[in-house]
Curated annotation (Swiss-Prot):
Species, as recorded: Paracoccus denitrificans
The EC number(s) this enzyme carries: 2.3.1.9
The protein's assembly and partners: Homotetramer.
Protein's UniProt keywords contain Nucleotide-binding: no
Lineage of source species: Bacteria, Pseudomonadati, Pseudomonadota, Alphaproteobacteria, Rhodobacterales
Top-rank lineage group of the source organism: Bacteria
Name of this protein: Acetyl-CoA acetyltransferase
Family statement drawn from the similarity comment of this UniProt entry: Belongs to the thiolase-like superfamily. Thiolase family.
GO molecular function terms attached to this record: acetyl-CoA C-acetyltransferase activity
Positions annotated as active site in the UniProt record: C88, H347, C377
Pfam families, per the entry: Thiolase_C (PF02803), Thiolase_N (PF00108)
Family annotation (SUPFAM superfamilies): Thiolase-like
Pathway named in the protein's UniProt entry: Metabolic intermediate biosynthesis; (R)-mevalonate biosynthesis; (R)-mevalonate from acetyl-CoA: step 1/3
Length: 391
């Protein structure tokens, strides 16, 4: 039976909150990577059957931002484009959906990925019913729609505190993990390891043009001493800080998916085959542990064991949850996030799933790795995972 394959991949640099991409809507970031994956695959844009993009923060962003990106870059008006919102897992779930589309014969070529501008998430107020007098509360849609647990009425950071308590993960462990992530990302950036996956973004302003070609959130020279001085963010006695958590970020990433037979017919060499994918649910209070059941399901579907994996990209929403995932999965930590993770690189929520997939794909190619896994935790208590294989 033919498999779904990824024939090209690309991502933008990850921008800091209110940083270089502060005024760039998500669909414009998305358009950049859509164009890049089509060009890198060497196919005619008119042959793209469908575009599927993850995006969490869509309030006031206009109708169907995936369609906006699709049309902006000149992909066919005759083919469809749509957004999914599975919170932090969106950008990876779209790739699983793309695989399903091509394997079922519902599409021949699908572009999948994610786009997000956390900087442009608006504040909003419910004024339609009218308010005769008194103050009016403005709602931060970034927090409400992206970072707030709807079931327990608290921030995602509190779920990380829950995991830290239940898994007995100390502040020291979290800080050490976070510094290691920063140091690995710094080393990777200096060595040019992200260059192949990144598409430079040109920012136009009254002062001229600026080209952004590197992730801007990575903190060079991060030390444990500095990390230890950051105050807890969600509880006075807590262990989760801004330093050992991922950031608020902007960015986009995409891959181009078709069947193995289609790639062979076109003479294209895939970056990897999609061996399996899975989602799973957990208690929303410990949402950060979602990758544990999701990864186990994906491995079982692929017929693999943890020991078969050569590389893992496990999103670092928080150091606490990342440590818990590593512990319970029992995989070799030396193969996990070898170039740093979201604590260092950043977490543009709807795009992160495809960002980690990009990083995994290019590192597998660099190391000639045969089996890899990408996984993320998801707000609301879920996880998503996808297994890749190379010949």
């Amino acid at each position: 039976m033919t498999k779904a394959v990824i024939v090209s991949a690309a991502r933008t640099p990850v921008g800091s909150f209110l940083g270089s991409f502060a005024n760039l809507p998500a669909h414009e970031l998305g358009a950049i990577v859509l164009k890049a994956v089509v060009e890198r695959a060497g196919i005619d844009p008119s042959e793209v059957s469908e575009t599927i993009l993850g995006q969490v923060l869509t309030a006031a962003q206009g109708q169907n931002p995936a369609r906006q990106a699709h049309i902006k870059v000149g992909l066919p008006r005759e083919s469809a484009a749509w957004v999914i919102n599975q919170v932090c897992g969106s950008g990876l779930r779209t790739v699983a959906l793309a695989a399903q589309q091509v394997l079922l014969g519902d599409a021949r070529i699908v572009v999948a990925g994610g786009q997000e501008s956390m900087s442009l998430a608006p504040h909003a107020a419910y004024i339609a019913p009218g308010q005769k007098m008194g103050d009016m509360k403005m709602l931060d849609t970034m927090i409400k729609d992206g970072l707030w647990d709807a079931f327990n009425d608290y921030h995602m950071g509190t779920t990380a505190e829950n995991v830290a308590g239940k898994w007995e993960i100390s502040r020291a462990e979290q800080d050490q993990f976070a510094v290691a992530s920063q140091n690995k990302a710094e080393a990777a950036q200096k060595a040019g390891k992200f260059a192949d996956e990144i598409v430079p973004v040109t920012i136009k302003s009254r002062k001229g043009e600026t080209v952004v070609d590197a992730d801007e959130y990575i903190r060079h020279g991060a030390t444990l001493e500095a990390m230890e001085n950051v105050r807890p963010a969600f509880s006075k006695e807590g262990t989760v800080t801004a330093g050992n958590a991922s950031g608020l970020n902007d960015g986009a990433a995409a891959v181009l998916v078709m069947t193995e037979d289609e790639a062979a017919r076109r003479g294209l060499t895939p970056l990897a085959r999609i061996a399996s994918y899975a989602t799973a649910g957990v208690d929303p209070q410990i949402m950060g542990t979602g990758p544990i059941p999701a990864s186990r399901k994906a491995l079982e579907k692929a017929g693999w064991s943890v020991g078969d994996l050569d590389l893992v990209e496990a999103n670092e929403a928080f150091a606490a949850q990342a440590i818990a995932v590593n512990r319970d999965m029992g995989w070799d930590p030396s193969i996990v996030n070898v170039n740093g993770g979201a604590i260092a690189i950043g977490h543009p929520i709807g795009a992160s799933g495809c960002r980690i997939l990009n990083t995994l794909l290019f590192e597998m190619q660099r190391r000639d790795a045969k089996k890899g896994l990408a996984t993320l935790c998801i707000g609301g208590g879920m996880g998503v995972a996808l297994c890749l294989e190379r010949p």
